Regions:
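Outer-membrane beta-barrel biogenesis signature
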Residues: 19-57, 63-64, 121-126
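Hydrophobic, lipid-facing positions within transmembrane beta-strands of outer-membrane proteins
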Residues: 39-41, 52-54, 71-75, 107-113, ...
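Solvent-exposed loop/turn segments connecting transmembrane beta-strands
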Residues: 64-70, 95-104, 173, 261-262, ...
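Outer-membrane pore/translocation modules
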Residues: 95-211, 252-261
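Outer membrane beta-barrel transmembrane domains
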Residues: 204-308
């Protein structure tokens, strides 16, 4: 009996390290429970929604470039198709501010799809990683424009692929720093163009255009100041290839134009307030200095998020 008890005690002693809780995991779990997030202004989540749940986050903004204002609304409306697969739509609407153009216009919508391949937990502290496959729809008007009217679309279907990464870092004060990285590449397809268009063609033009490809790199960070308040900061770099337009203006000679490449780098400080685990708001400003063949702009924005 004594030998059995000794053997049992030895087994317990040997197994205790394997069964004992990971103190770092415990600290991560406590910190994650004490933090609420909206997400930064620009960088997207690498997580997916639980199956059957819905996420809504409408954005309201005013893009300011020089003396021109371009107010509008966009956002994310997503559904958990599977626990590791989220789909959704990103609409875009803008409001004309010119005296002859004060109506609401529809821009290009984007269909969203994201498959998560890795999931951060307090016990498994590898980054969350998701593969992104989106599709831009040519819902905005790009040609057949009346005189003095602006276009709000590209006219092109544009597949987009990328990767989203998200990681948590536990700081010495017990609060969390959450970091995100997004890498995206967009490939617009060739499409027909008729008349006045966003590509600068005249009223009698007939031809086609291939919009520039676009590469986007976003790095974002959020610091959980308190349970409700979060400080956020994003840096986004965008690079565009060459847009090509080919056709004829009426009976004139064949036209072939190619735009130069362009790029810019902007940043977006923001403040989040989350009044519950399911709802919050963010206010920030996206500031883009003048880049290579791009104008400077300042875009204040506010968004309200809700998990259903």
């Amino acid at each position: 009996m004594k030998s059995f008890a000794a053997a049992f005690a030895a087994a317990v002693l040997w197994s205790t390290p394997a069964l004992a809780a990971d103190p770092v995991a415990d600290r991560y779990a406590a910190a994650m429970k004490a933090a609420r997030w909206t997400g930064p202004l620009l960088a997207s989540n690498a997580e997916t929604l639980p199956k059957g749940h819905v996420y809504t986050e409408p954005y309201f903004f005013d893009g300011i470039s020089g003396s021109d204002h371009h107010p509008g609304t966009s956002g994310f409306y997503q559904y958990g198709l599977r626990d590791n697969w989220t789909v959704g739509v990103q609409p875009f609407f803008s409001l004309g501010t010119q005296r002859h153009n004060r109506e609401m216009a529809v821009g290009d919508f984007k269909l969203l799809s994201q498959v998560r391949v890795s999931h951060f937990t307090p016990d498994h502290r590898a980054p969350s990683v998701a593969i992104v496959t989106n599709l831009v729809l040519p819902t905005g008007k790009d040609d057949h424009l009346a005189a003095l009217k602006q276009g709000h679309g590209s006219g092109s279907f544009a597949p987009e692929v990328g990767i989203n990464v998200q990681q948590y870092f536990l700081l010495g004060n017990g609060r969390l720093l959450r970091a995100r990285v997004n890498v995206l590449r967009q490939f617009p397809l060739r499409h027909d163009v008729t008349g006045r268009s966003v590509y600068g063609t005249g009223p009698d033009f007939r031809g086609h255009a291939r919009p520039a490809s676009k590469t986007t790199l976003i790095a974002g960070a959020e610091y959980s100041l308190t349970r409700e308040w979060v400080l956020a900061f994003d840096v986004e770099a965008d690079a565009w290839g060459r847009t090509k337009v080919v056709g004829r203006d009426g009976d004139g000679p064949r036209i072939r134009s190619t735009s130069p490449r362009s790029w810019n780098v902007g940043f977006a400080p923001a403040v989040e307030y989350n009044w519950s685990d399911r709802a919050g708001a963010i206010f920030g400003v996206w500031i883009v200095p003048e880049g290579h063949n791009t104008a400077a702009s300042v875009t204040p924005a506010i968004a309200i998020q809700r998990f259903w």
